[in-house]
Amino acid sequence: MKLISLFLFAFSALLFSIASFAENYTTLHNDTYSIDFNQPEKPVVLIVWASWCGYCMEEIPHLKKELKDHPEFTWLGLNVNKNPEDGRQVEVERALPWPSLSDPDLIIGDQFKVRGTPTLIVLNSKGDAVYRGRRTDDDFKAALDTLSAEQ
């Protein structure tokens, strides 16, 4: 009986954590952004970045080009700065064409098992992470092309 109770508790905790992944989030400009990471309306490219990350800044022009090549995706930044104002400043100065969610406590980042910046995560429309890594990896482009062909 204890084993069944433990199983039911663990299962309900899992369901709660999955359900809580469909939320309204706050952008760097304090706007509300709604997305269900479990079942997004279309594939998502999640760009995990920070203003102090030199590699992140180097990626921006390349990612802007990828966005032009793949407008059928939802492109979304995940800024992990402790001070969101630093992220806001970069977003404006570099004219980022995608909104960025503010995640200073890595609440979203932890759900995606983010361990550093820059990290790119590509989700299919079922919410499965089909790619996790850096843009310089050939697999990133392959993941975009594969999902694009499935659209």
Language model feature labels by segment:
Residues 48-65:
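Conserved redox-active cysteine motifs that mediate thiol-disulfide chemistry
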Residues 45-46, 75, 120:
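Hydrophobic beta-strand anchors of alpha/beta hydrolase catalytic cores
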Residues 1-8:
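Bacterial N-terminal signal peptides that target proteins for export
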Residues 92-96, 104-147:
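Thiol/disulfide oxidoreductase modules built on the thioredoxin-like
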Residues 24-44:
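A short beta-strand-turn-helix
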